[in-house]
């Protein structure tokens, strides 16, 4: 029997708009849930601990980004390899991609936890922690690090479960942990007054429960059956998965590097301004995480696009690939435009959600929102287009595009502009990098659609 005509999934036949909504909505929910872990902690910490607590979560944020980077490396990489193989009818080979990816997700999480706990204080100082924030950051990060293997497994396996044709299951796994985290945050931080430790413990418990659900559903796949031999690590399998997951992973690693440089710059140039060290770090941390909610919507769309484009490209249905990309980009633009309007017109109301502060605190926050995120309305192009190239088996293009904003444009601007403009230079680096990265993405995808398969 032809494996492509069994009940694997309808990726090659159903209307692409219907498929994108079917896969993107659970992906968006999953990404929102991942962002809300940080947002919920920020909310309760801001209202019960204060500015120093908010600054502490921003100092530890590079480690959270590291977790997402690993999850995307083996999650999107494994899902893309799986769908490309299934599209070609290579079902037996496809199952190895899921098994190997799941093992690598958890194993890398254990390694990251070990490194973090062994070098906790040096890492936090390297990330730019001021002295008056360090104790808060150590308490929070030392506990949250225990949950890294479960966070990475849950986030990465969500892509594998979606690739198996079960996007709603992936959404349920993530949503369950987030709801539990929110309830426990309210109990531990607001009621029991456990501060930073309470927020961290709530986060870890939610992640462990989500990981348990993921393990159950991975062991009961819809289109393939995972056996013990599929869990044995194969160099060739991991190499293929890693090549396809490099683009989204590189983007996260670049984001982590930028976050570290950003924290150090905010600390240094903040000390030379009227704001001091802590206010810029606390404000930038909140705004970064609010922006992550917007980016979660965009990344969710790109992840929902991935199985559709991978399968149809493997099956040589190029018109469906192009149609899916264009519809995803249209959805991304609408979301980006709404985010732009919110960031420009109600920044004070947004920042007030996370607690009160001095007038200097609000002054910096409002300026940072309006300037740094000015080109939000074109920020959808880079993540959607980068993931598109990866999903059709062109990881080099995807990787290059994923690094344009963070490494090619933003990082040099963060170093150069503040030399002439002080802390304002940090703010203006954002829109310049966003505009240039969007232009590169448009040029690359326009060139791709001029090639023979798509004409």
Regions found by a protein language model. Name each.
Residues 144-162, 170-178, 199-212, 299-302, ...:
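Short runs within selected transmembrane alpha-helices of multi-pass transporters and secretion channels
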Residues 54-114, 151-170, 281-341, 345-347, ...:
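Small-residue-rich hydrophobic transmembrane alpha-helices
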Residues 1-24, 82-149, 191-246, 309-374, ...:
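Short alpha-helical transmembrane segments in multi-pass integral membrane proteins
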Residues 36-54, 124-131, 187-194, 256-287, ...:
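Helix-terminus/linker motif at the lipid-water interface of multi-pass membrane proteins
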Residues 27, 31, 43, 80, ...:
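Transmembrane alpha-helix boundary and packing residues in multipass membrane permease domains
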Residues 409-418:
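Transmembrane alpha-helical segments of integral membrane proteins
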Residues 22-41, 143, 177, 206-210, ...:
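Transmembrane helical elements of multi-pass membrane transporters/channels
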Residues 17-36, 40, 63-70, 146, ...:
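Residue-level signal for short hydrophobic patches within transmembrane helices
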């Amino acid at each position: 029997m032809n494996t492509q005509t069994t009940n694997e999934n309808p990726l090659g036949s159903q209307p692409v708009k219907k498929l994108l909504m079917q896969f993107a909505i659970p992906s968006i929910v999953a990404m929102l849930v991942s962002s809300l872990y940080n947002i919920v902690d920020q909310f309760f910490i801001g209202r019960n601990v204060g500015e120093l607590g908010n600054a502490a979560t921003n100092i530890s944020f590079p480690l959270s980004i590291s977790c997402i980077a690993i999850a995307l490396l083996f999650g999107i990489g494994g899902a893309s390899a799986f769908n490309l193989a299934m599209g070609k009818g290579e079902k037996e080979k496809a199952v190895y991609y899921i098994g190997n990816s799941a093992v690598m997700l958890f194993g890398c999480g254990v390694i990251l936890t070990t490194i973090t706990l062994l070098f906790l204080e040096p890492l936090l100082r390297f990330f730019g922690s001021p002295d008056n924030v360090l104790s808060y950051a150590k308490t929070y990060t030392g506990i949250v690090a225990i949950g890294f293997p479960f966070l990475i497994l849950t986030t990465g396996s969500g892509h594998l479960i979606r690739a198996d044709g079960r996007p709603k299951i992936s959404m349920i796994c993530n949503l369950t942990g987030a709801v539990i985290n929110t309830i426990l945050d309210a109990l531990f931080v607001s009621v029991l007054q456990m501060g930073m430790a309470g927020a961290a413990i709530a986060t870890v418990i939610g992640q462990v429960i989500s990981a348990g659900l993921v393990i159950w559903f991975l062991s009961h796949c819809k289109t393939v059956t995972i056996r013990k031999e599929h869990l044995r690590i194969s160099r060739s399998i991991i190499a293929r998965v890693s090549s396809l997951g490099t683009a989204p992973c590189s983007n996260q690693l670049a984001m982590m590097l930028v976050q570290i440089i950003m924290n150090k710059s905010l600390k240094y140039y903040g000390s030379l301004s009227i704001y001091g060290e802590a206010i810029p770090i606390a404000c930038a941390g909140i705004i970064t995480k609010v922006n992550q909610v917007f980016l979660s919507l965009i990344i969710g769309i790109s992840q929902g696009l991935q199985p559709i484009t991978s399968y149809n490209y493997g099956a040589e249905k190029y018109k469906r690939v192009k149609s899916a990309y264009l519809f995803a980009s249209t959805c991304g633009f609408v979301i980006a435009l709404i985010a732009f309007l919110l960031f420009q017109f109600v920044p004070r109301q947004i920042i007030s959600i996370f607690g009160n502060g001095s007038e200097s605190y609000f002054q910096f926050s409002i300026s940072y929102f309006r300037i740094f995120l000015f080109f939000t309305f074109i920020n959808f192009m880079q993540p959607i287009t980068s993931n598109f190239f990866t999903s059709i088996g062109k990881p080099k293009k995807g990787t290059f595009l994923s690094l344009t904003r963070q490494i090619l444009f933003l990082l040099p601007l963060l170093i150069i502009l503040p030399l002439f403009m002080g802390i304002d230079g940090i703010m203006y680096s954002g829109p310049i990098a966003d505009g240039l990265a969007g232009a590169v993405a448009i040029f690359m995808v326009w060139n791709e659609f001029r090639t023979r398969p798509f004409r």
